[in-house]
Every structure is written in structure tokens, then in C-alpha cells.
Design a protein with these regions (language model features):
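Long, structured stretches of catalytic cores involved in phosphate-ester chemistry, encompassing
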Residues: 1-343
Length: 344
């Protein structure tokens, strides 16, 4: 289903009931069907045809939702758990697990489909359930080409601690500049999914209720600037102390369009809308027929970026891209793309 709050349209997904279970579908490679700790394990061997995550009905819903911007300026996705396994230690600071199939990083192929559909709306993903607060940038084909995901901490985390702790204790490529955290950057999770770790809140001491990394998360949508700020507060923090009271690495502000991190191949003409209106703009790659993204313009103008050479189609409308079509547009360098005046 969906809910719009203050001009932000949230898709609400059920990411449990339609997901395939591992028992009987893949060989058990750990103490229980969804935990893998076999050192010979190959992530590709468990990404089998026919496995599903959201299921076809919810995938269709996400596609339709991404193209319908009625009364919305920004979008977000809510679900129970994360589309990756951004955890190394489960239950204790030395209890390393190679892969956790309980997260939405498995099955991998439908995971990629879900993340790609979220990317089409330049939406962030908000969830919980992982017992460890993290902000990641999802990758599909390449690191960083997908949307941001914020997993909030457990409000009370007495049952099951988790830690982000790479085996080599090194940051990945492209670490976050000036981060107070040592292990940020590009990684693959235990399922082979590409993720960029932006921030994590490891428990300092599971026996100290003030140091076990429980707390709460806040996402602030700035419609004027088209940004989202992720905040992550320890349970016993005093918010009057300002941002310094948050977990190290937070707050984090991301631009709406950064939820699509594909490499830009060129730009279509900048669209200038009559009367300063902000219609919905959809960009389609002609060769594949793929919808690249559907978003609402800001400031009465919008310059579409595309990720391949060749012809593209732009559709425009007030709430959905259903009023005007501009066909046969080819990308150029931004400085040479020009402008088009459009009445929408």
C-alpha cells in the first residue's frame, strides 16, 4: 500500500510473507536454514530461478507507484528489513556469519529487481529489523549505482547484538571522507550484493545499557532542497546537545537525485516549464524500452540525464507522465544540450 505525508509519498511493502524460504530450496550450510557459515559457500549457488522476494504483485505495485506522483514532491519506501546483509557478527562480537538469508539481500536476483524499482523514483529505503543501525548505498550493476538505505537501530537491543566488522579490518574503496568510523567504503555483503557502507553503530559493550547501540532513527525530507537527512540517536542521548549526541557518522544528508548513481552518458535538453510549474517527468531509453526514472521537477525546470547514447523519450504530466511526449531526444554534453520550453 502507500501513504502520503506532507507531500512525501511512501510505498509500504510486505517483505516477509511473499519471500521464498531457504529450507528445502537450497542446501543447509549452517546451524539453521537461513544462516551460512560454510567456508566453501559460493553466493551464486543460492540465487536460484523461481525464488522470490516481494513477488510479482508487489513488483507491479512498485512500478506503478514510481510513476504516480499525485500530491507528492518526494518519495520513500518503507519495509521491515534491509535489501542487503550489512552485518558480520551475529549475537556476539566474535560470532562471525558468512551470510544471513533472513535479510532482503537474498534471493539476490529479486533483490536487485526491488532496488532497481526503488531507484526509478529516486526514493530512499527506510527499515529496521537488523539489530544494527547502518546507512548504505545500494549497488546493482556497480557500487553506488542504486538508492540509499537507512536501517534504524532497535529501540531496546537486549536480545541480539550485531556488528559491522570486516575480516581484514580495513576500509573499502571510496571510504567516506573524514568519517569517524574506520570501515566505510565499497564492499560486497555475504550474499555478493554490492553495498557502500556510509555509517554503522556497533555496540561498544553489550552489558552496559548505555553502550549497546540501541536507539532510534529519524529521516527528515526537505522538499525545498530535495534532500533527505538521516539521524541516528542513542537511546539515552540528550537531543538538546545537538548533532554531537548522535551516533558517530550521523547525521547524513543525501540529495534526492543521488538515489540514482548510474554513470551519466549525457544530457537531454533542459526543460523549462510555463508558469514555473513542476510537472512529473519520465525518461525512457528507446533501445530497451526501459523507464530510467520518473520524478517531479523543481524550480520550474528539469534537465534529464541519461546513461547511454542513442534516442530517448521524455513524458510529462502534472501528476503522472501522461500529458505530453517528447520523442527522439539524443544526449549531448550538458553545455551543448540546449533548452526546450514546455507547456505542461
Amino acid at each position: 500500500t502507500r501513504i502520503t505525508v506532507g507531500g512525501v509519498d511512501f510505498a509500504v511493502l510486505e517483505d516477509r510473507k511473499f519471500k521464498s524460504g531457504p529450507a528445502g530450496k537450497i542446501p543447509q550450510m549452517g546451524p539453521r536454514p537461513d544462516h551460512i557459515n560454510d567456508p566453501k559457500y559460493d553466493p551464486k549457488t543460492i540465487d536460484l530461478p523461481g525464488l522470490q522476494l516481494l513477488g510479482p504483485r508487489q513488483e507491479k505495485f512498485l512500478k506503478n507507484w514510481s510513476e504516480d506522483w499525485t500530491n507528492a514532491e518526494m518519495k520513500g519506501v518503507l519495509s521491515q528489513t534491509a535489501f542487503c546483509g550489512a552485518v558480520h557478527m551475529h549475537g556476539g562480537p566474535k560470532s562471525r556469519l558468512l551470510a544471513d538469508l533472513d535479510c532482503n539481500g537474498w534471493p539476490q536476483t529479486p533483490r536487485n529487481k526491488a532496488v532497481e524499482l526503488i531507484r526509478r523514483a529516486w526514493a530512499v529505503h527506510l527499515c529496521g529489523d537488523q539489530h544494527l543501525a547502518v546507512v548504505v548505498k545500494h549497488g546493482i550493476s556497480d557500487h553506488g549505482d542504486g538508492p540509499y538505505g537507512f536501517t534504524s537501530p532497535a529501540l531496546v537491543n537486549t536480545i541480539y547484538g550485531r556488528w559491522w566488522h570486516p575480516l581484514d579490518e580495513q576500509s573499502g574503496p571510496n571510504p567516506v571522507p573524514n568519517s569517524p568510523l574506520p570501515w566505510t567504503g565499497d564492499f560486497k555483503d555475504g550474499l555478493g550484493n554490492k553495498i557502500s557502507m556510509i555509517a554503522y553503530a556497533n555496540p561498544e559493550n553489550r552489558n552496559d545499557e548505555k553502550k549497546r547501540a540501541d536507539g532510534y532513527g529519524i529521516a527528515r525530507f526537505n522538499k525545498k532542497n530535495r534532500t533527505v537527512t538521516f539521524e541516528c540517536w542513542p537511546r539515552f542521548s540528550d537531543v538538546r546537545h545537538g548533532d554531537g549526541a548522535q551516533f558517530p557518522g550521523w547525521p547524513i544528508t543525501v540529495a534526492q537525485d543521488a538515489n540514482d548513481g548510474r554513470k551519466v552518458a549525457g544530457y537531454l535538453p533542459e526543460l523549462i516549464f510555463a508558469n514555473g510549474k513542476n510537472p512529473v517527468v519520465q525518461v525512457i531509453e528507446d533501445k530497451s524500452g526501459d523507464v530510467l526514472y520518473t520524478v517531479r521537477a523543481r524550480g520550474g525546470r528539469f534537465q534529464p540525464r541519461v546513461y547511454s547514447k542513442g534516442k530517448h523519450t521524455v513524458k510529462i504530466g502534472l501528476q503522472k507522465p501522461d500529458a505530453k511526449t517528447l520523442a527522439g531526444l539524443e544526449p549531448k554534453p550538458k553545455s551543448a544540450a540546449g533548452e526546450l520550453n514546455v507547456s505542461a
